[in-house]
A protein has these predicted regions:
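Short, low-complexity, disordered segments immediately C-terminal to signal peptides
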Residues: 23-50
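Glycine-centered hinge/linker elements that transmit conformational signals in sensory
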Residues: 237-272, 313, 317-320
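Short, well-ordered beta-strand elements
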Residues: 47-65, 83-88, 110-111, 159, ...
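C-terminal lobe and pocket-closing loops
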Residues: 299-307, 323-329, 337-440, 478-479
Length: 480
């Protein structure tokens, strides 16, 4: 009888565990949706294999600052004295070609970044499967929510991971706003507020323009307005260019033609407006907003701008008017371990150390503060990139290295849901851009729209169908 009761109790307990587990697994937040539609992990049920104690050598290649790479390599070797890290230096121009040449001779680095088009890396079988390590690593729970599920290109295997993060940044000239007696927007500004401000800050009689672009409205609008997980309205399953992309393309075109957008570099219009066709509009003091990237923070602190009375301050890309997320476009560099590496476990640890681990970031912060060039000057005038993890100590450490201004506090608080651009994150995307978006029957779609040759709304459905077709064909070609 006791044995029977014990068995019944055991069965009941097991049933309870199964029910609770299933209930827990069914609760998935929007932030857990992958760019490929979602990826579950079993971190609680797996353990990372031990690192080898053998004497081994790992090679590493990225286009990050070489002195920083060497500093991190030295710190990694201090932690693992049995591992030698060799840095492979390549020119960033033609990066993927250089990797192709190395791979052809069996010398693909154990850990490497690939540039732009992920199809090249997949087609050439460069990407090693790190699923076993990534899914079992408890450190990865601290990754920024939108960074956890990228890199599962076939929906199953972790083939790449985010290694570097520069957010899209909208710079506002605070002095110009003050000059025109226009109040600076809230750090929680919305997309429509940005569009309205561009028009309000355009003063033709004073030769003042609302904005200038490096980054684009057509990239921002679908991500922030559709709570998308990628460019062109990518929702984890498909693209949609029929709404916000088309609206943004037409809006930008109207602004170019009406003088809200500053004259383009090296044009007759720039010559007429600034007296120098080669003068960057952002350095004239006559542009209210510069749509750009985080790496420009340091440039805008240079005397070229300060001495002209230009005070560029950073804002995050505004939130969509009806958005439920803080998703914002970002330049994300992706890293991978080589499919040919003899030491995948150790290569994974090296990739993480250089990319997103807290320990690696602690060393990065120290490097930003202390590394000097041959003349004794600091190599980094400001931190290079933002953390890929949530750890507040790391964010606080980075904040301490930035100017003492509330704009930086406001920015960092709202820059923790980056969305990577398509080429490096989505199979088929770059091929679609090359063959359709910039080189298809419409020519350069954005240029044709700006010139009034096509209406973005008229071609958006065709572009949507082709974008989804290119993705499907890429998945079939690359994985099946």
């Amino acid at each position: 009888m006791l044995r029977k009761n014990w068995l019944l109790l055991l069965l009941a307990t097991l049933l309870l565990v199964v029910v609770v587990g299933c209930s827990s697994d069914s609760e998935v937040s929007d932030d857990d949706k992958a760019n490929e539609g979602g990826k579950e992990t079993d971190q609680d049920q797996q353990e990372l294999p031990e690192m080898t104690e053998e004497e081994i050598t790992l090679s590493y290649a990225s286009w990050a600052n070489h002195e920083l790479n060497q500093y991190l390599a030295d710190r990694f070797m201090e932690k693992y004295p049995n591992i030698t890290v060799e840095l492979v230096q390549l020119e960033q121009e033609g990066w993927n070609d250089h990797l192709t040449n190395l791979a052809s001779t069996g010398e693909l680095p154990d850990v490497f970044w690939y540039l732009g088009n992920v199809d090249i890396a997949i087609r050439n079988a460069w990407l090693g499967d790190m699923t076993e390590y990534f899914n079992a690593d408890p450190e990865n729970e601290d990754l920024l929510d939108t960074m956890k599920d990228v890199g599962y290109f076939d929906g199953e295997r972790k083939l790449a991971a985010p290694a570097n993060y520069y957010p899209y940044t909208v710079f506002l000239d605070e002095n110009l706003f003050e000059q025109l007696n226009v109040e600076m927007p809230s750090p929680d500004w919305t997309y429509s507020e940005m569009i309205d401000l561009m028009q309000k800050m355009t003063v033709p009689e004073q030769g003042i323009y609302g904005y200038n672009t490096f980054t684009k409205l057509v990239t921002m609008a679908p991500i922030v307005n559709q709570d998308a997980f990628g460019e062109f309205g990518w929702d984890g399953e498909s693209y949609d260019l029929t709404t916000d992309w088309a609206d943004a393309a037409m809006q930008h075109s109207e602004f170019v033609r009406s003088g809200v957008h500053a004259p383009f570099f090296d044009t007759d219009e720039a010559e007429a407006a600034f007296g120098d066709r080669l003068l960057w509009a952002a350095s004239t003091g006559r542009v209210a907003m510069q749509l750009d990237a985080w790496w420009t923070v340091g440039l805008f602190a240079e005397p070229e701008f300060v001495d002209k009375g230009i005070k560029w301050v950073p804002y995050v890309v505004p939130k969509g008017d009806n958005a439920s997320t803080e998703n914002k476009p970002a330049f994300i560099d992706f890293g991978a371990i080589s499919s040919a590496t003899e030491y995948p476990r150790e290569a994974y640890e090296l990739l993480k150390f250089f990319g997103w681990s807290k320990e690696g970031w602690e060393h990065k912060l120290e490097a930003f503060k202390t590394l000097q060039d041959d003349t004794g000057n600091l190599i980094f005038q400001h931190p290079d990139g933002l953390p890929l993890i949530k750890d507040q100590e790391i964010w606080d450490g980075l904040r301490a290295l930035l100017p003492d201004s509330h704009y930086y506090d406001d920015f960092l608080q709202r820059a923790k849901h980056p969305i990577p651009l398509g080429g490096a994150a989505q199979p088929g995307f770059q091929t679609f851009l090359d063959e359709v978006y910039f080189g298809g029957e419409y020519g350069d779609v954005e240029l044709a729209t700006a010139n009034g040759e096509v209406n973005a709304h008229d071609i958006a459905q065709d572009l949507t169908e082709k974008a989804n077709q290119y993705r499907e064909e890429a998945i079939e070609e690359l994985f099946y």
